[in-house]
Amino acid sequence: MNRRSFLAASSSGVAAMSASAATAAAQPSGKTFLVAHGAWSAGWAWKKMHPLMAAAGHRLVTPTYTGLGEREHLASPSIDLETHIQDMLGVIKFEQLENFILIGHSYGGMVATGVADRVPERISRVIYLDAFVPKDGQAMVDLLGVDAAARVRQGVKNGDGWRVAPSAIPPDTSAEDAEWIHGLRLPQPLKTLETPVRLRHGDTKIPRSYVYYTRIGPGDPFHAFAARAKAEHWDYHELDASHSAHVTAPQPLMTLLHSIASA
């Protein structure tokens, strides 16, 4: 190779490297998402999201609360909301999670709110997915409303006396997914729904997003939280999905989560 050819090749190589670096710089860096799952559920319910997260360059961490899923053997009447908050804090500590996005789905909004209050310095954003958003001193039964809370407690009395049976799954769930979910969901300790969240630092200063699923089921309790999020000027989104979008609409949910993380 003569000198002119060498210089031309070198220039082309530098240009290609510069273009590659520019492309890489333009792409958002991967994020870590930690999921606080809903009632009766567990980490297994998010299995459709793992490959989608990986393909988008993100990491998804989906632990299971004490007494549910693969931790069923630890179930007891003493399990409460604080137990589940401590579960999540343990994962954050031992997985050494920093600058991560915390997701709370449904009941998981109760857990996520408590977690965000304890370790705000580790969390870059909280995303509530069709979730309860309590204020200090509120329990989930308070947010359900008097009639719904009474039905929950009556159902517990009619059952084993300490657990709440799973609710109906969304009607647009496929037969295959319905069989999968029915086979794995477990009753939830009532005390987790009766324990008020205690916020040591008041309303969080962490950026928050609320995603409201618009395929509304009967007795929808989440419209009030969506309205609050809009009134308080949160980052607000709506998704054409029923209550378990991670099961019934994983790709649209992934697209939205990636967009929120990249903003």
Where are these regions (language model features)?
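Active-site nucleophile elbow and catalytic-triad environment of alpha/beta-hydrolase enzymes
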Residues: G183-R200
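Active-site loop/oxyanion-hole signature of alpha/beta-hydrolase fold enzymes
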Residues: Y65-F100, D117-R118, L143-G145
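Flexible "cap/lid" loop of the alpha/beta hydrolase fold
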Residues: Y128-G159, P221
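Catalytic active-site module of serine/aspartate enzymes centered on a nucleophile-bearing elbow/loop
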Residues: H237, A241-A263
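N-terminal export signals
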Residues: S5-A25
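Conserved HGGG/HGGXW glycine-rich cap/lid loop of the alpha/beta-hydrolase fold
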Residues: K31-E70
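Conserved hydrolase catalytic core segment
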Residues: I101-D136
